[in-house]
């Protein structure tokens, strides 16, 4: 799933008044978390590059990267939809809906983390014995 596909899908499922840039930043925060907490903890994680998504007027000059692939692939890409829905609900002070959306996100995030753990070797830590 690409960044623009995730945002378009959320806009269809949960009409909202938040800008494309807001949702882009939220997706960047989540993929940064995925990279830092999950991917980097396993061998080969440093080979997978991640550049945060930023609005087109960002200083990095790369534009919004709307066609960039999100880090979690199918079938785990649903977590992005749940995450954006949760952020929208929280920002709208709809806390009951937020709790539901966040629980769905956490379940999807956990499923991705567990699958990544099964499929990749963990980094070993070097120990000094002196």
Please name every model-derived segment.
Residues 1-69, 107-130:
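Conserved short "hinge" loops at termini or chain/domain junctions
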Residues 24-25, 99-103:
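Short, charged, amphipathic alpha-helical segments
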Residues 30-33, 75, 96:
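Surface-exposed peri-terminal alpha-helical interaction modules
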Residues 69-78:
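Structural motif
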Residues 78-90:
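Short, hydrophobic/amphipathic alpha-helical patches that form generic packing surfaces
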Residues 88-98:
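Short helix-capping/linker segments at secondary-structure and domain boundaries
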Residues 96-101, 120:
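Hydrophobic alpha-helical segments
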């Amino acid at each position: 799933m690409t960044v623009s596909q995730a945002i378009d899908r959320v806009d269809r499922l949960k009409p909202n008044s938040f800008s494309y840039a807001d949702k882009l930043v939220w997706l960047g925060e989540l993929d940064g978390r995925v990279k830092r907490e999950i991917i980097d903890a396993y061998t080969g994680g440093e080979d997978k590059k991640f550049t945060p998504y930023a609005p087109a007027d960002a200083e990095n000059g790369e534009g919004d990267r709307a066609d960039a692939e999100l880090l979690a692939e199918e079938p785990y890409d649903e977590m992005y939809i749940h995450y954006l829905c949760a952020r929208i609900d929280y920002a709208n002070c709809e806390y009951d809906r937020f709790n539901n959306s966040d629980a769905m996100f956490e379940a999807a995030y956990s499923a991705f983390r567990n699958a990544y753990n099964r499929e990749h070797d963990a980094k070993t830590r070097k120990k000094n014995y002196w």
